[in-house]
Curated annotation (Swiss-Prot):
This is S-adenosylmethionine synthase. It comes from the Bacteria. It catalyses: L-methionine + ATP + H2O = S-adenosyl-L-methionine + phosphate + diphosphate. Keywords: ATP-binding, Cytoplasm, Magnesium, Metal-binding, Nucleotide-binding, One-carbon metabolism, Potassium, Transferase. It comes from Treponema denticola (strain ATCC 35405 / DSM 14222 / CIP 103919 / JCM 8153 / KCTC 15104). It is found in: Cytoplasm. One of its GO terms (molecular function) is methionine adenosyltransferase activity. GO terms for biological process: one-carbon metabolic process; S-adenosylmethionine biosynthetic process. Homotetramer; dimer of dimers.
Length: 389
């Protein structure tokens, strides 16, 4: 890309957004299964509406999972403790509609399907997954999505600590960044909509959210300007929220979960899925690969696509795109990737140590750009450089 002026916008939603409530419940169920039975097969979906949480899907596990307790504890942890907030963890109905995994799927995953793949763990489904990394932030993530997550994470902290006592759980933000080529040069626009108690005045709400939430988070980036535009609760009121205001469903925030629209998405959601589902595990591996490519200074931007067929124990395709920023040809990077990384479903699980109860923490504020997760390590840079030579 030339050094043209351009703008890119990404949004995030808070842990109290109805869809994120559902993601967190689904991943908490997954964690409960993996904690006692790492071989659990889980595809857990959650639906939340007025006074109701419904948990369904396919689970095969050797442990007992208390769906009622998990759903209520997650809602309480988020802050849904009063019907006025959009949901009450104590009085809401919780329905359990879970059943076991299809044996037709299971035989492909367990290595008991076609003779040519006997004994090898196959992919849990077909599909393509993308990973992305760039040098816009220290986390090697796109700036708009990282900034959006950071604002909402800080707002939730102030809400839970009652520093801003009139905030309620539901919120979302959207940030537009001005670029010169691929370089962020200014935060152009910040949109923040936050649920609140009915008695707070709009002027106080707007001033507080700008000066006590947005500026403390985004100020240190050096990208806020005097003419940065702020749109705070643009309708003027956001009292009704949570599942009462909008129905929630697992897997409806896949762009929030990944790169904010910068970098492609294969379409598969993450939450509620055990690591045999390549929708999740291969997307994590693709991020791991792309981040190591960028950290190794082989490119300033990198997108990796992996593709799988159900029951097949290896990727059917691998693709690399450096958007013209590569220091070496893409075919060389692709060849090095195939040498350095084990992209088989079993290899991904082993490399990233994915049969652990780590998933509930991924289910709000993005799955990427967070150093606590194994797919964010940059421990393959030297191996990649060596493989390039």
């Amino acid at each position: 890309m030339k050094n043209d002026i351009n703008y890119f916008t990404s949004e995030s939603v808070s842990e109290g957004h109805p869809d994120k409530l559902c993601d967190q419940i689904s991943d908490a169920v997954l964690d409960a299964c993996l904690r006692d039975d790492p071989e659990s097969h889980v595809a857990c979906e959650t639906f939340a509406s007025t006074a109701l949480v419904l948990v369904g899907g396919e689970i095969t596990t050797n442990t007992y999972v208390d769906i009622q307790e998990i759903a209520r504890s997650i809602a309480e942890e988020i802050g849904y403790t009063n019907t006025d907030f959009g949901l009450d963890c104590h009085s809401m109905a919780v329905m359990n509609m879970i059943h076991s995994q299809s044996p037709d799927i299971s035989q492909g995953v367990d290595g008991t399907g076609l003779d040519e793949y006997k004994g090898q763990q196959g992919a849990g489904d077909q599909g393509m997954m993308f990973g992305f990394a760039c040098k816009e932030t220290p986390e090697l993530m796109p700036a708009p999505i990282m900034f959006s997550h950071s604002v909402l994470r800080y707002a939730a902290k102030l809400r839970k600590e009652k520093v801003i006592p009139w905030l309620r759980p539901d919120s979302k933000t959207q940030i537009t960044v001005k670029y010169e080529g691929f370089k962020p040069i200014k935060i152009d626009t910040v949109v923040l909509s936050h649920q609140h108690y009915p008695d707070v005045q709009y002027d106080e709400l707007k001033d507080t959210l700008i000066n006590r939430v947005i500026k403390p988070v985004l100020g240190p980036t050096g990208l806020l300007a005097d003419d940065t535009k702020y749109f705070i609760n643009p309708t003027g009121r956001f009292v009704i929220g949570g599942p009462f205001g909008d129905t929630g469903l697992t897997g409806r925030k896949i762009i929030v979960d990944t790169y904010g629209g910068m970098g492609r998405h294969g379409g598969g959601a993450f939450s509620g899925k055990d690591p045999s589902k390549v929708d999740r595990s291969a997307a994590y591996m693709a991020r791991y690969i792309a981040k190591n490519v960028v950290a190794a200074d082989l490119a300033r931007r990198c997108e990796v696509q992996l593709a799988y067929a159900i029951g097949v124990p290896f990727p059917v395709a691998v693709r690399v795109d450096t958007f013209g920023t590569g220091e070496v040809p893409e075919e060389k990077i692709e060849k090095a990737i195939k040498e350095v990384f084990d992209m088989s479903p079993a290899g991904i699980i082993k490399t990233l140590d994915l049969k652990r109860p780590i998933y509930k923490e991924t289910a709000a504020y993005g799955h990427f750009g967070r150093p606590e997760f194994s797919w964010e390590k940059t421990d393959k840079t030297e191996a990649l450089k060596k493989a390039i030579k």
